[in-house]
């Protein structure tokens, strides 16, 4: 099962792309954060807009920062805690924008 082309159009308009289908009913979509983090989001194909909405709603900025702060300056991770925080906030906004745009599609 694949996502409908109308959803792919929304993804492309916001610089997201379909990365892969997992074979178990999920799809991986990808984008890059302002600081260059490779974001790969895995959600259900069925009810795709709702799945993205739930992922965006549940994305925890603090948890994301905690995961990265111990790797500051490594492998492309920003060395500044402030930049990591700002980037995590931007990721949350990217996810919310994508979710909102997908939910508007009829």
Where are the predicted features?
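Generic alpha-helix signal with a bias toward terminal, lower-confidence helices
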Residues: 23, 28, 53-57, 96-97
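Negatively charged, low-complexity tracts enriched in Asp/Glu with abundant Ser/Thr
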Residues: 1-37, 75-81, 103-106
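Intrinsically disordered, low-complexity regulatory segments enriched in Ser/Thr/Pro
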Residues: 36-87
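Low-complexity, intrinsically disordered/propeptide-like segments
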Residues: 14-17, 42, 51, 71, ...
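Charge-rich, solvent-exposed alpha-helical interaction surfaces
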Residues: 6, 10-13, 64, 87-101
